[in-house]
Amino acid sequence: MKTSFLAAAAISVLSTGSLVAFAQQNPAPAPNMSFFVTSSNPKGGNLGGLTGADAVCQSLARAVGSTKTWRAYLSTSTVDAKTRIGNGPWYNFKGERIAQNIADLHSANNKISADTALTEKGTKPNYLSGNPPAPPAGQQLQHDMMTGSKEDGTKDADTCKDWTVGDGSAKTMLGHADRLGRNAGVNSWNAVHASQGCGMEQLQPTGSTGLFYCFAN
């Protein structure tokens, strides 16, 4: 009986320790989190349209405990990204406000940067850093975010054919989440340059792994 009790107590201690370690390694997002950069995207530009892209945002958010309704910040030939994401304000994983409203988000006053553009897990993608800006040594640069949008949040001509193409037959407009570039003044978070294509092999050379922004509306 004593042996069984000690064994049960040991298991309890180990389980508690494991839970504590898990919590320490996987901190929960701030309750008001309503903005994040996707932590992954294995599909490139072929997201299954806006419905598929929204599903990616929703799935990633739910995996970290968010019950909000999430939308991808992506435009199509008939939809402007800025009309999809609600009215704000929006906060990142840490609870830091990145914009008060739509106008603020698409102005020079927004707070999206290498320090605030965090994933749903609170991690930072491989952004540029230093002076001059350079990617992490030996790692794939990830600062190009797919948006298919212009700086004002309206549709651009390049949207990976409305997010249904994942090869070199189409392109997407990209923004710099870290607000840095090799050229001075190139710092828009949602519209800097077009990709070489919509597959991973075309996205990676310019600094993308197909990541994009998600907002809770």
Question: Where do the PLM segments sit?
Answer:
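Positively charged n-region of N-terminal signal peptides that target proteins for export
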Residues: 1-4
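Secreted/extracellular ectodomain signature
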Residues: 22-217
